[in-house]
Each structure stands twice: as C-alpha cells, then as structure tokens.
Amino acid sequence: MEQHLKSIPLQDDTKKKGILSFFQNTTTVKSNKFLTKEKDVITLDDPKEDVSGPMIETVKQETMKSINKECADEMKTTPKKANAEDKLLCYKNSPIQSTKYDRNTNKQVPNGNIIAIETKSRSSSPCSKRELSSSKKEEAKREKELKKQQRAEEKHRKELLRQEEKKKKELKVEEERQRRAELKKQKEEEKRRKEEARLEAKRRKEEERLKKEEEIRLKEEAKERAQSRIGNFFKKLSDSNTPVVEKSDYEKFFLPFYAKDGVRVSNKWKLTKVELEGSKRKIDDELLNSKDKTSSDDLLNWLQSRRLPRGHKIKRKAVDVLQQMPLKEKTDDELQSLLAQVPHKYIKFYENVRPPFIGTYSMDFTLPPNDPFSTKGTGFNYDYDSDVEWVNEEEEGEVDNLESGEEEEEEEDDEDVPSEGEFDGFLDSEENSDLDGLPCAKRKFVGPLIPTICLKSNFENLSEENKRYLQQLKAEVIIETDGPIDPFKEPKTSSLPSKRSNSDLQAQTASQSQSPEKKQKAMITDPMDLLRLFDGVQDSTFSLGTVTEIAQKNLPQYNKQTIKNTIKEYAIRSSGKGDLPRKWVIKDAQNWENLRANANMPTPSL
C-alpha cells in the first residue's frame, strides 16, 4: 500500500470533486508532490508546515468514512472493477480542502494547506477494504445466482404454461375435427340410404318393365310360331319390289338365340344396369371408408365369401335308385320321384348331328389342375366320335327358319316318290311267292342262333325247308362272260333284250302320264357361286346342316334350302368305314375342273 502511494502522482483535476468536498474552503492541487515515507504526510504548498494535534484524528476519521462510503457505492455499481487501489486513486485525484492549524496553540488556522495523516491509521484501511470487497463479491455472486435461478424457474413455469395451452388448443382442434368427421359421415350415410332407396325403387320399376316386355315377347313369339306353321302350308309369292335389307357381318356370324320348347335361359348371373351400378357403388364405399388395415381385411374376407363354390354336391346317385328298384314295396310313382332327384345332363354340341345326350350323371371325381384333359378314372374316350355312326341327316327346319329370319321353301321329300323300278323286286316276290310250288314263309327263330356249316355234298340230305332257305343264299353270276375279265378294256355293250315285258313298259308309261309334273328344286346355277360352294364342301367332315350354314355365310344371297338342294345334287358323303371320317366329295370332279377353267380360278390346295 505504501509503495503504491509513493508511485502515484497527484494530478490536477478541476472537473471532478474529491472526497473532502464537504469542507467550505477548497483548494486545487497545483503542484505534483509525492507522498514520502519519512514524514508520512501529504505536502501541498509549504513542506515546512505540518498539522498536529487532536484535529488530525478527526480529519482522519471523517476521511475514512467518506472513502468507505464512496467505495461501497462504487462496489454496488461496478463490483468487479472496484478495489483498494482505485479507491486510493479516487482519494488522491479528488480536490483537497484543508484547514491550517497553529503548531503552538494547536488551533485551527483558516485557509491552511497541510493535512497530516498518521502511518498507522493509514495502513489499516486496505485490509478492511479487501474484506469488504470479497464479501461484496460473494454477496453479489449469490444474488446473481439467485436471480439466475429465479429466471430459470420463471422460464420453466412459462414453458409449462405454454405447453398446457398448446395441448388445450390441439385437443380443441381434434374435437372439432372429429365432430366435423362425424357430421360428414352422418351426411354420407343419409345420402347412401337415400341413394339405395332410389336405386331399389328404380330396380323394381326396371324388373316390372322387363317382366312386361318378356310377356309381350313370349306372346309375339307364340303368335309368330303359329303363323309360321300355318304359312308352311301355303306358298308365298316372292315380291321382287321388296327392298333387300343387308345384314352386318356381326348379324351374319352371330345369329340370335332361339329357346326351344322346354328350354329356359338361365339369368342367374345377369344383373340389370341399376343393380350393377348399386353393387359397384357399395364396394367403392367400403374401399373409401376403410382407413385401417382391419377394415381392409374385413373387405377381403367379404369378397372371398361372395365367391361361389365350383360344382354342386350330388345328394343322390343313380346307383342308390337302382338298388331300391327291386324292392316290391316301392311303387312306380315313388321310383319316378327318386329318379327325378338324380341330376340329369343335357349335352349338345354345335357340330353334332345326332340328338343330344340326355341322362343321369352322378360320378364324383376331380380333374387334376396340371392335366385337365386327363381321362384317367373317368371312363371318357375323346378319340371316339359317336357322331360318325349317325346317318340321319334330317334337320329341324322350323328352328333354322327362325334363326335365319327367312321364309324358306318347303322341301319336298324325294324318298316318298317311288323311283323307276323301285318296287319291282317286291312285285316279283309277290308274284313268285311260291318257289317250286312251295310257299315261302318267314322263319321265326326262338332262342340264340348257332352258326353251322353245311357242305354241298350233304345238300341232298337236308330237309325241304332248309333247301329252300339255302337256295335263297346261293351265289349267282351277274354278268355271264367267257374267259377272264380284263380290267383295262372297256366292257362290250350287250344287245340283249330287256327282261321287262311290253305290258310293264305300257304300265310305266301310263303311270307317268297320270302322275302330275314333278316340281323342280331351286338350286344355284351361277358358276362363280358354284365354285365357292364346291370349295367349302369338298373334304368337309361336318353334317349337312352345318355345311349349309357355313356355305350360307359365304353366299348370303341364297337361302338354306337352295344351298342344301345344290349340295345334295353335286356332292355325296362317304360312308367313313374304319377309322376314316365321313367326308363330303364332289360327284363329278371333271365338271368342277371345267367350271374352274372357264372362270380362270386357281385350283385350291388341299
């Protein structure tokens, strides 16, 4: 402390007031004097003058009080920068007001300029300042930490309030959103119910309308069917002025379906337009309203539950009915009712000529998915074509007329008109009923037939009845000729007279003159159309009706009856012996080639 006092000069500062400003008379330090250790006094003007006496103690105490007070004030404002040295500098630089004392009388002398400060009292001041400064610092530090803690608590409290306010606001927004969603859902549900009610009413109206239309259509079909039956007895004159309505390709290839008597068209999977729209809208609503995975799974399960199983379980089999048939306590009506419970099959294909299969089928088996055409364990044989053995080529003319929409000419049955010499054999058998004077009676066989061999050497030992029977089975020569027959030469024309008598010729001439003139059949005469017909018929394995329909698609200007007559006239169907299929073949191949040569058409590749 004393060293600092030696090194600090006294500076002149007239603007700042010192700690001794409470004295009345103030003097400004004009000289820069230093504090000396030997005298321990502050010399201002006259170094010889000094102050002593009891007033020095008073001045010292008052000075220390002022210094302590000023230091305390400065510590409150700037606690980090205040220290003992600064206080001394403040004390040094402040203007000093002094009072001069008389040495001898020890009285105060006005306007004095010497102040004496004892070294002992001055040396005790820095320690108290340091302690005061450290205590102030600690107190200030505690106050600072306390304020910091208070600020942190205040901040935490505000944060909690803010979060609570935010949660309340979010809860309010969520409640508002749920309320709006519930209101929207109620509106959609109400709208859906109204839409379903509207669709249901519309569907009922549509069903009633379709029912009325179906009744009207059935009445019209029955009326047209009756008119067509009546119209078949009369020949309708063709009107050349009637405009021909050309059909589109779709109408030519896809003919309208005609339900026969006893046939009902199934509409199990048929939905009206209104029902289809309602079903689609229902599924769309389920998909749109499902927000979580659970709803989606429920929808998938619902769709799978709507899938119908394949096939139907057979409740009663034909074997069970057959086992109950020998029982005597069952009546015919009961057996018929049991038989009606067995499922029946009606199988018909477009290409087949023979009637469709109608019967029971109760075999229970499952086809393998990797080989659905397998016939193992089924008893089926797809290689066998039962249609080949069917020879009857009669067609249902009524159905064909209804499908084609044209009124065809009535086909005359050529087989009803006896041909020339057709009944000669029957007349001969009647005339020659007695062979060798013995009646020819039909033999009746009772029991199974046993094959036997009869040699010619034993012919005389047979009975007369067996002789007559074997006489009918003997071989006869058709053409009597001498020597071998050369197959590479033309046979000679025989000039033998006709076996038929003149009376037979006269009777035939008379019968022809009496019979009415035979009606000529309508056939195709255009060479180009004939060539197109022959190309489609040659080597075809279809029946006559199917070939006629196929040819009519290529020749729509002719009706079915005309095409059928032309096919019968120019083509014949092979017998199909063995494994060979029955094919249509043109009778006169040379005529076919001549037509092709005249038309300059290339030969089709077979």
UniProtKB/Swiss-Prot annotation:
Pfam families: Cac1_C, CAF1A_acidic, CAF1A_dimeriz. The keyword Chaperone applies. Residues 116-212, 393-438, 483-520 are annotated as: Disordered. The keyword Nucleus applies. It comes from the Eukaryota. Belongs to the RLF2 family. Keywords: Chaperone, Chromatin regulator, Coiled coil, DNA damage, DNA repair, DNA replication, Nucleus, Phosphoprotein. Residues 393-434 have a biased composition (Acidic residues). Residues 493-515 have a biased composition (Polar residues). The modification Phosphothreonine is found at residues 78, 509. This is Chromatin assembly factor 1 subunit A.
